[in-house]
Amino acid sequence: MACDPLTRAQILIEALPYIQQYQGRVIVIKYGGAAMVHQERRAEVLRDIVFLACVGIRPVLVHGGGPEINSWLQKLDIPFKFVDGLRVTDAATMEVVEMVLVGKVNKQIVQLISLAGGSAVGLCGRDGNLIRARSQGRAEIGFVGEVSSINPQLVQTLLEGGQIPVISSVAADETGQAYNINADTVAGELAASLGAEKLILLTDTPGILRDPEDPSSLITLLDIETARQLIQTGVVRGGMIPKVQCCIRALAQGVRAAHILDGGSPHSLLLELLTDAGVGTKLIPSQFSAQLREQSNGFR
């Protein structure tokens, strides 16, 4: 439903201090998985990212594409399976992963950003020696890697030139062997290396829930210590564990805040960043938790 002009003006005024606070700051956004399935919602998310860039914020987008990979593996009659939530990646699967993420999904995102009036450059970890990968050392999962090192210079250059870097989570080791790396992990490590203001994980859940069956049990703010306790007590479980661990690691390396929210909810990114209430879960370093909780008007 359309709102009246006065309400629109009030919305803009509410967003103003957040825009001023984050202007010129880097925000790393991870987008992928089920949250990318619906084409209209995907285009909307990318328009929101273009909006952030237009008001002076410096977004960096890291993407996955699991459903798209599954679809192409099925088309090519290549069987696939997962172990402990990780895609078993043999040589044939790795070839498809790189083809889909780097050659298809990445370029689709760049094109949608262009159609929304933004300017983006598509990359993978191989480009400009951006990401050096290494094996996880588990033979049963094949070419599933982890981040060995990041050279953020190329991304910094693109940001300074007003571009939106769009990065797929494929990288190679020192021999040139390609690896499939978890996109959450890449986003977290990249956020740390860039000294980002925020790490945003767009998922298919509202955030961290005390009860996974009850969306109203959303935890809106927690610090590193509390997040670790929630993992230990089983409140955070399943696929949410690596996401929370990724946020904890990024915060420990200097990222000021991390957010987990539903990428499929309309304009969730803008609502989380530019409104007082937010819509997801915000994680903060422990040393800031007491101070921030006392600030009723603190920035998201």
UniProtKB/Swiss-Prot annotation:
Species assigned in the record: Synechococcus sp. (strain JA-3-3Ab)
KW Kinase (keyword) present: yes
Stored NCBIfam families: argB
Locations listed in the record: Cytoplasm
Keyword Cell membrane applies: no
Chain residues that bind substrate: 65-66, 87, 180
Entry keyword set: Amino-acid biosynthesis, Arginine biosynthesis, ATP-binding, Cytoplasm, Kinase, Nucleotide-binding, Transferase
One BP annotation, GO: L-arginine biosynthetic process
Protein name as annotated: Acetylglutamate kinase
Annotated metabolic or biological route of this protein: Amino-acid biosynthesis; L-arginine biosynthesis; N(2)-acetyl-L-ornithine from L-glutamate: step 2/4
GO molecular function: acetylglutamate kinase activity; ATP binding
Source species, domain of life: Bacteria
Reaction equation(s) it catalyzes: N-acetyl-L-glutamate + ATP = N-acetyl-L-glutamyl 5-phosphate + ADP
CDD domains: AAK_NAGK-C
Family: Belongs to the acetylglutamate kinase family. ArgB subfamily.
Enzyme Commission code(s) on record: 2.7.2.8
Annotated site residue numbers, Transition state stabilizer: 30, 243
Function: Catalyzes the ATP-dependent phosphorylation of N-acetyl-L-glutamate.
A Pfam family annotated for this UniProt entry: AA_kinase
Assigned GO CC terms: cytoplasm
